[in-house]
From Swiss-Prot:
Source organism: Corynebacterium jeikeium (strain K411)
Statement: the UniProt record of this protein carries the keyword Nucleotide-binding: yes
One Pfam family matching this protein: EF-G_D2
Compositional bias per record (Basic residues), positions renumbered to this chain: 296-305
Region (G2): 452-456
Region (G4): 531-534
Annotated region (G5), positions in chain: 567-569
GO molecular function, one term: GTP binding
Family listed: Belongs to the TRAFAC class translation factor GTPase superfamily. Classic translation factor GTPase family. IF-2 subfamily.
Biased composition (Low complexity): 75-87, 151-169, 202-211
Protein name in the entry: Translation initiation factor IF-2
UniProtKB keywords: Cytoplasm, GTP-binding, Initiation factor, Nucleotide-binding, Protein biosynthesis
Amino acid sequence: MAGKLRVHELAKELGVTSKELLATLKEQGEFVKTASSTVQPPVVKKMKKHYGVGEESAKESATTPSPAAKPGPKPAAKAAPKAAAKPGPKPGPKPGPQPVKNTNPVAGAGTRPTSTVKPGEKPAPKPGAKPAPKTAAKPTPKPGAKPGPKPGGAKPGAKPGPKPGGRAPRVANNPFSSGAPAERPAPRPRGGQAGPGDMPRPGSRPGGAKKAGPKPGGAKQGGGRRPSPAMMPSHPNPAQMPSKSDNFGGGRGRGGRHGGPGGPGGPGGPGGPRGGRGGRRGGTAGAFGRPGGAPRKGRKSKRQKRNEYEAMQAPSVVGGVKLPNGKGAKIRLARGASLMDFAEKIKADAAALVQALFNLGEMVTATQSVSDETLMLLGEEMDYKVEVVSPEDEDRELLESFDLQFGEDEGEDEDLAQRPPVVTVMGHVDHGKTRLLDTIRKANVGSGEAGGITQHIGAYQVSVSMEGEDRLVTFLDTPGHEAFTAMRARGAKSTDIAILVVAADDGVMPQTVEAINHAKAADIPVVVAVNKIDKEGAQPDKIRGQLTEYGLIPEEYGGETMFVDISAKQGTNIDQLLESVLLTADASLDLRANPDMDAQGVAIEAHLDRGRGPVATIIVQRGTLRVGDSIVVGDAYGRVRRMIDEHGNDVQEAGPSRPVQVLGLTSVSGAGDNLLVVDEDRTARQIADRRDARRRNALAARSRKRVSLEDLDSVLKETNTLNLILKGDNAGTVEALEDALLKIEVDDEVDLNIIDRGVGAVTETNVNLAAASDAVIIGFNVRAEGKATEVANAEGVDIRYYSIIYKAIEEVEAALKGMLKPIYEEKQIGTAEIRQIFKASSVGLIAGCMVETGKVRRNAQARLVRDGNVVAEKTTIESLRREKDDVTEVSAGYECGMVLSYPDIQVDDIIEVFELVEVPRT
């Protein structure tokens, strides 16, 4: 067949249904969708070969019987009823002229059995010289008869006549054969046609042999039983097809013996007397006289092997989209990765992943960050094990890609030198932490703090004299307010020893317990300073007993924790406290670092200075930081232009445990970010850009909310959202304010959304963003600059300024509560009983009532009750009269007439009058 065919056209040509052909094509590994799909010519040829049609369409004229040769010899007429499904009176049954699906375009359904003619030999003038004496039950034509007039015989060049019983022309008379006839494959038996070996040709078994000998085509012939029209499948069933050896002597049935060398079949019948496995064709002759292939063994065919291989390599189908099959492979993705990153890992098209997620009900773009759950779900669908890398591991891998490492000293043990201990002062708010540092530094830090509370981390290095030797100690002062949890945790991670300050007159408080937990999590030793022992009501022993419950057991009680009773205000026992700190450091810690390596440290604070730009407070942990070094701090990078110590003096280099302020960064770093010195500015910029992209992706993935069917109803409801823009004087304060605001829990009806935050003054850009998003700007220790105030007034943007953090928290919480939908409570005003009903043409029914309790007011809401059942829940008193006067209210004990908005009223009904009072939300 030239050109392409559609599936339904090919099915019609093959004589099967489109559904069966589609199933066969899919079994063969050809992916077609519908019956209208086109099929390539090689596939058409393969399907014709599979269904045993071959080139029948091209040879139709050779196989179509002619109605001119109906009469046939009588033996054929007797054999036909045996082989046909329905016996007919004529020797040639009606199904004979029907087209036969046959791989042999010349031979018909009744191809002559056991005729073996080798190529190159002259065919014998008679197909056989002997009749089969053992199987013959009826007379057969004489062997000397001429082959020309035999039924089904076709002379060269002449049209073949009708073949009684569906007999095929003699092989020697094949008009398409150029030489000696070759072996032909057996046709498929059809209903009403004689099977192989049934034709009463000379030299073959006569049709009556079925009564005495083995049944041709039966179980003993090696090709399975003869199919009947009722048993015929829609396409060839290998288990029931006759073996090729039933038709030609050169064939061989599966498991049977070779047939005879030609002429009539032996006593066992062609193909061997034993029953072989049906379904597999033997080694048969090729078409048009070409030699056939070797017989198949019990091994798998190439087609089967290919199908198995394709099944193993079959792609995964996710949401109707073909995607690679991971086969359990593990891939690592960063938190907040996009589908583009996923596609790059698995060598797939990102558009296919987008389409797959869209079909699964998730609408994302290729570059949009997706949540960890979505990445894992998509990986499971494709048989990939997705591992979401933690930020710490991802940052370590990022540094390793640049051949950098953070957190370990370089060099040998002899390269390490002693460094000062880093001590963090922690405790509850207003327990005297900053006063203690003031006393140690002999300075007044607390007076500069708004509200008398510390709102950022201070880093100082002081010299302490111990046993006649001056030693340096670095102190970190952390906030004690509950809003600064992240700062205290960051201070604990950056320190060697913690001083826990507890007021002797106040005892253990919530932030005290939190500080203990931070110290335990960081695995650092704790020295307890019991402060305010000079005040009345101080109970140092009670403090020791309370802290015992949290694992801090004093040395006098047999524990390992040093307790020192001090008075920061009076300066009592301060030297003893410092000595205890140094003793703990010497006894418990190995405080050494390599000062000769590239500097590494941590940023404990960062802010934006108007004249100096971004400023970061750094504690060097190892190595030496010098002016001019290229540094990267989190997602900020730059070159050290200037370093300032705690006294405001410039320093050229800072060794281990030295706190300094660093100028020269391109942006404000995050509090708690690691500092790293690199060789080139380009490397620093690349690391910072990668970190910034990772941070933004993680933030986008965290802010995306997945909506399920369960919470769809609540999402569709109207939700009030308070949008905020936070600006502060330093990064730590902004971080603490954001954490505190996000912890406010009011109700599900309102939501708090922080759309932007930053360090520095409120700019015009912030005001424009607030105007576009209907947000409120909160400035903490900063003011608006330039034209920001004018633009805010013109746009109606609300800017709030705060210097104390808990005041900002209280006002934001109050604003959220004000956004809640009001709750109304019903308050009963009075009741009235209907005594009589009057009819008025202008207003309808008028209820003549007696006010029993309270008052009845005009336009008030009322409830109509009849026999204890509520008849009308919400009705209104439209008109109220006392005698003939319109009144606004009538008190108890008086009669009145009223008109209700609900007309169905009866005598003895009770009217309950009430009003709705708004209840404030808390």
